[in-house]
Amino acid sequence: KLIGNNEKKIPEDKLSVLMDSFVARFSDFPDTITMASGARSCYNEAFHISERDIAGKPDRLLLQWVDAEYTLFQKMEEKVYSPLFHRNFSNVSEFTETANQILNRRKSRAGKSLEHHLASVFDASHIVYEEQVITEDNKKPDFIFPDGRCYHNFDFPADLLISLAAKTTCKDRWRQVISEADRIPEKHLFTLQQAISKNQLKEMKDSHVHLVVPQKYITTYPEKYRND
């Protein structure tokens, strides 16, 4: 039997319906954890994703969740900002201020949402971790493995501790990771940024920062650093 285009689109159509239903529940933007959880829930239901699927294909599903959340966020923007579409701005400053508020909301949401999606992967994989553990000088790494109690217990071997930061892009902010957990000399940084330059990768390596990226992005990096 030949499968028509309409049948192929059933999961995508269901995803759109689920997202519309989610958006209808809110009059304003929900917090990031609610938005991230909603995107995952919509995607997992539409495509019949199980916990076993998440544990088995975390790289692929993480990226699909990120894409799904961006689509969901756009739908929420359409609802919340629709009154502005026909508004007459009195001057350029008023217009740019409004535009900047919209863009800044997007930027501030992205990083925290990535943390929520990573946590969901760890949960599905039954990995023990703790978020936002307070370390030296009130620093707060995004994730400590196994947890803060082990980190602060100096009888617990330091080589069994892992620190992971999550940043959608690295740029200069990756340096924040270096001082976030003194007991852990080798830091890990998860990012969605592709094609980082050789110079920046060398600087990261020299600073004992190890990148963690989705598998499909590895080929965008210089071959010399793909196995680091």
Predicted regions and their residues:
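Terminal, charged accessory segments of proteins
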Residues: 1-37
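Proteins with a high burden of low-complexity, intrinsically disordered sequence enriched in S/T/G/P/A and R
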Residues: 2-9, 34, 43-54, 58, ...
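Detector for Asparagine
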Residues: 5-6, 44, 88-91, 100, ...
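Serine/threonine-rich low-complexity intrinsically disordered regions
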Residues: 11-14, 25, 29-31, 50, ...
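Interdomain/boundary linker segments immediately adjacent to catalytic/signaling cores
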Residues: 23-112
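Catalytic core segments in nucleotide and nucleic-acid processing enzymes
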Residues: 116-119, 123-124, 129-228
